[in-house]
Curated annotation (Swiss-Prot):
GO terms for biological process: L-histidine catabolic process to glutamate and formamide; L-histidine catabolic process to glutamate and formate. Binds 1 NAD(+) per subunit. It is found in: Cytoplasm. Its main location: cytoplasm. NAD(+) binds at residues 52-53, 130, 176-178, 196, 201, 242-243, 263-267, 273-274, 322, 492. This is Urocanate hydratase. Gene3D superfamilies: Urocanase like domains (3.40.50.10730), Urocanase superfamily (3.40.1770.10).
Amino acid sequence: MSSGKYRQQEIRAPRGTTLTAKSWLTEAPLRMLMNNLDPEVAENPNELVVYGGIGRAARNWECYDAIVDSLTHLESDETLLVQSGKPVGVFKTHENAPRVLIANSNLVPHWATWEHFNELDAKGLAMYGQMTAGSWIYIGSQGIVQGTYETFVEAGRQHYNGSLKGRWVLTAGLGGMGGAQPLAATLAGACSLNIECQQSRIDFRLRTRYVDEQADNLDDALARINKYTSQGKTVSIALCGNAADIVPELVARGVRPDLVTDQTSAHDPLHGYLPTGWSWEEYQQKAKTDPEGTVLAAKKSMAEHVRAMLAFSDMGVPTFDYGNNIRQMAKEIGVENAFDFPGFVPAYIRPLFCRGIGPFRWVALSGDPQDIYKTDAKVKEIVADDAHLHHWLDMARERINFQGLPARICWVGLEWRQKLGLAFNEMVRSGEVSAPIVIGRDHLDSGSVASPNRETEAMQDGSDAVSDWPLLNALLNTASGATWVSLHHGGGVGMGFSQHAGMVIVCDGTDEAAARIARVLHNDPATGVMRHADAGYDIAIDCAKEQGLNLPMIAATQGKH
């Protein structure tokens, strides 16, 4: 690693109501930055890595210290600018402006490659922010559990008459994102076999109850799968090994899963996908001494993995890419038909995006789990007639361990986000919860990302690669008064393949917060409805009309203003 990226230090966000910074609007980003590096949350906190290969919260430890110092002293009418994990300026703005504006990993398109980025990273000039690592709103694996759950449920509806009972999912990767898969499969009613090449990550998921058991070897894993599926039980099984070896072996044995996907860190071949025959230590060493050879070896292994996934697809097994760009990596190494199986968004999620539905999340800055349980109840009260959502909240409370500050993920859309945010703000005002709440989301949302191999794959108008939309989303959230706004490149699928934006808003119980919340939590999901309506999706056009959006080029929305 470059100098300054390693420091052995245990970081945990402050709890309670005593401020370190000058107001809750600066205390909130300070606590969430620290929470991203909590050892219960981050994958490799000593190197500032939160999740997703090398997704960091700050460029180096010197930058981290400077961010903390800046946030601690930031005034209520100042804005901190963060450039690829480095605090570069504090400017006078106004009290309703964002307190922090973040730009991470952005490169001019011609130079937007891993090779160029890695050169800059080695010089200390850049940082990979993933999506929520560098934007300080990562909440551990819970952040993707419901999205994965919704995907598996929809796959069961489409392929298995609405039930995954007695069926099993084959997948790989138990990192910060992939670690959600076993629990999501369990909650969706399926067993799962989860391949992971690092024992430490399996241990982490066992400890946090995201995975139930570990098998000793492939034969043992298959025996357990056969036993549990025949009994109609839902048990998740981890297997330590290399997916590029094990998935082809399953094809060779004629084993037939019921769903096949993958969430290894294939988006980053230099840091995130172990070549076959290599130990993890060897991989890390060769990444430094022979990066080109390492990338080639990783991509060759990905090619074998994808060929096996294609074989399952050819058998008629529902097979889909879960957004890690493994198909692209395989295609670059010669697997011309790598895109013969779809990504999860066009296959299962896009109708939700058309209504602005996506990963709404909130965090109790108090550190008190009771604050989250009270907000769970408030969501049920407000969204009273959504049995599916209520079921999710019940399962989340029962099965999901909080990592770091207590948090909740809950997929809701344009119709509800503003109402929920205002209700949470009122709970802070009345003292029903003990401290302010922050509301954010993944950058994987309906209007905040352009990613042709993931969120915007196979758009019906062909606009997959148009990245004006996340830029407009970030600009509108800034104008609307979000507490911090981020604009990133390369999250999820790697350099050159995505641009995306994030926002976080603080509910501190004030009238001023209520006004900001009303703007931000309407406008943010509305950009998703707008983006899909512009692409011609009837569901989005109908939603825009129902919600009174003013979209000048969409005739159905005119005449109501």
